[in-house]
Amino acid sequence: MDKHRRDDSPSGLSDIVERDGLLGTGITSRHIEAFGRKVTSTAGHLMGPSGDPSTSTHYQNAMVDIHRELRRPSTQRKVFALAQTTPTDLVRSKLSTSEIQSRAISSLPDELLLNIPDDTSSYSLFEGFQATQNDHEYRKAHRRGRSKGKKLLKDKDGEQADPPSTLTELKKERDLLSRRMELMGVRKNMCSSEIVDIDNKIANFHRMRQIVLDRLAGLEMEEAELEHEVNEIDNKLDDMAEEEAAQAAQAAAAAAAATTAGSETHEEPASEDPAMDASFMSESIYQKLPSPRSLKHRSIRKRSMPVLHEHFAPGSEIKEFQAHTDVVTALDLDYPFGTMITAALDDTVRVWDLNIGRCTGFLEGHNASVRCLQIEDNVVATGSMDATVKLWDLSRARTTHRDNRVNKDEDDDAVSVAYSTSLEDCHVYSLDAHVGEVTALHFKGNTLVSGSADKTLRHWDLVKGRCVQTLDVLWAAAQASSLGNESQWRPSGRLPDASADFVGAVQCFDAALACGTADGMVRLWDLRSGQVHRSLVGHTGPVSCLQFDDVHLVTGSLDRSIRIWDLRMGSIYDAYGYDKPVTSMMFDTKRIVAAAGENVVKVYDKADGHHWDCGAGVGADETGPDPAIVERVRLKDGFLIEGRRDGIVAAWTC
């Protein structure tokens, strides 16, 4: 059995020892075994019991000589040097360099043999190397040789040219072509292998990208919660500072009143009326007293803007939720994954946290549905069918932390927050000068402009909370017609749609105001003079939406068109149309999005002029029932939100 194991050794060392000897010395295993038997018998003979005294004396004398020899310094140095020598040095001392190289190439250890990968390729490594070589020289020589044989059909004497190639040459040519075909097959297999390898790498990269995206989403959620807590602390600090200032002002006023009353005690008795006592206060002290209800523009600046939506493909859905039970009439957001305000015909105004997709509260106070709204930092303005405009300060919201975190896994929503918000104290004041429903509004800084069905525009001062001036649209149109700037109230000769809002859209910036009305006109006002500075004629239907920047003004109308105006020239820069009326529109630096009576959002790329659709209706024919028609859209930094007729609100990347 042992012999069989030695002969069948996978490394083949026994065969090598039998053939080449031990360490290349020519001594085989049989010689070693014979030498061992001789040493054993000799030692047994010398050390065993024997009756010959000369033999034992001879052995003792030999041991004494060996001991004396080992005590010499030269012998000890040799023994110590041999003890420090490694087995590798011993092998190198016995084998030459060429023999070592030959053994390293011809014999491999078992560890390396086990690590050899399985050969699943149809071609060898050498064939792959040959296939990668450039055969340009072969093609060049091959074409030259064939062209020489076919250059002339006859010689100069008119005789036949050289006869065709011999059979040997044709066979050689065929072998060469066959070899080239084999190389082509090897190259095809190599290309296929590279494609498979690239596909695997792409799949791995996609998995890695998804993992990093999930990590980024978690970081942004944690960042939003931390920033929410920081804003709460900042608001508390501001409130405490205001309370301290108010207490100091009241103390100063009380001290001044006491001093005044003490100095006049000998002249007349103190009045029993508190109002009479207050009359002795200094007017400067009154001016220092804070207003019980004032609008605080606390600019909520993001320390780092969300970037998760920028890493999704355009048209990807981010969130979708049932926001209302009826048609969405207005919506707006402050920044991507921030705060969103929605209003619908169900007479509710809701505040949403887009980071978690949950409603954080209601803005209650209107007696009818809200038709228009806007959020800027922490301030929200809402215009309703009850002819009022209300201002809300979201920084006054009270946040209560929930300590009960039991049964968190039973919640259907995987994302939850540890706080709930009460918006009861967010209302600042109401602006109620209109006599018709408010259909459009816009504010910037401390200036707010509202448009109503009473055919007027009102300019409001948000610091004082009162109307500064009223702009009569009909009077301005009549004045422009009398001066010849406008041909008539309706230049197209068409009656406006009865369901269309008289004031469809407004936007203000500093002293500039743009207003779109039901006659299809876009008027540019100067708020300092209250006069129309310029009128843009082009739409044949009521203007439903508009927005302008430093150079262009974009308008959408129920005449199914969107027009881009050049504010410097006062002329049309570009225009395009859709199949149905445009009800809502907004643009950013890259795209213009619009709701045009379909179940998708219409997107227009400014750079290349490409039109494409975004929304749930893109694949509705394949997935199931058609979604509802989109009524309102808003766009901020590539983050798109859209509200539908069935009350669903969805967020998309754009």
Curated annotation (Swiss-Prot):
Its biological purpose: Involved in mitochondrial fission. Acts as an adapter protein required to form mitochondrial fission complexes. Formation of these complexes is required to promote constriction and fission of the mitochondrial compartment at a late step in mitochondrial division.
SUPFAM superfamilies documented for this protein: WD40 repeat-like
Source taxon at top rank: Eukaryota
Keywords on record: Coiled coil, Membrane, Mitochondrion, Mitochondrion outer membrane, Repeat, WD repeat
Protein name: Mitochondrial division protein 1
Keyword Coiled coil annotated: yes
Low complexity composition-biased segments: 249-261
Family per record: Belongs to the WD repeat MDV1/CAF4 family.
Pfam families membership: WD40
Chain intervals with Basic residues compositional bias: 139-151
Organism for this UniProt entry: Emericella nidulans (strain FGSC A4 / ATCC 38163 / CBS 112.46 / NRRL 194 / M139)
